[in-house]
Amino acid sequence: MEKYLVIAVGGSIGAILRYLTGVYSAKFFGTWLPYGTLIVNVVGSFILSFFMILFLEKLSLDPLWRLFVAVGFCGSYTTLSSITYETLSIVMDGDYVRALLNIALNFGLSFLSAFAGIVLARML
């Protein structure tokens, strides 16, 4: 039961932060691209990689922390379904360049962010 509670708490925090990121990124950056999804995926990729390296290689923590961060928080904070839906919406508007840019930015920057998280965690 403890595992489920840890996942639920992490998931609740991730979901709320995801919502707030979407709201405030639209206000700050506009809506030309789905910036909120881009931000949560790039930041979430970094967080997941960084903390998994810390948990697996550097720190001796209760495995519940991995569930909290990886399954709970990052599981609700990041999303592939939003990228898919938002990109298809852009395609349906006929803006193929913007759709490709959205895909490239989400996957390219998320990959680089995850790599940076691993490198930074290993430097600690």
Curated annotation (Swiss-Prot):
Which Pfam family, an example, fits this chain? CRCB
Coiled coil: which residue ranges?
none
Q: Indicate whether Cell inner membrane appears among the record's keywords.
A: yes
Activity control: Na(+) is not transported, but it plays an essential structural role and its presence is essential for fluoride channel function.
| Topology versus the membrane | Multi-pass membrane protein
Q: What GO terms describe the biological role, i.e. biological process, of this protein? A: cellular detoxification of fluoride
GO terms for MF:
fluoride channel activity; metal ion binding
What the entry lists under InterPro entries is as follows: FluC
Protein's recorded name: Fluoride-specific ion channel FluC
Species:
Sulfurihydrogenibium sp. (strain YO3AOP1)
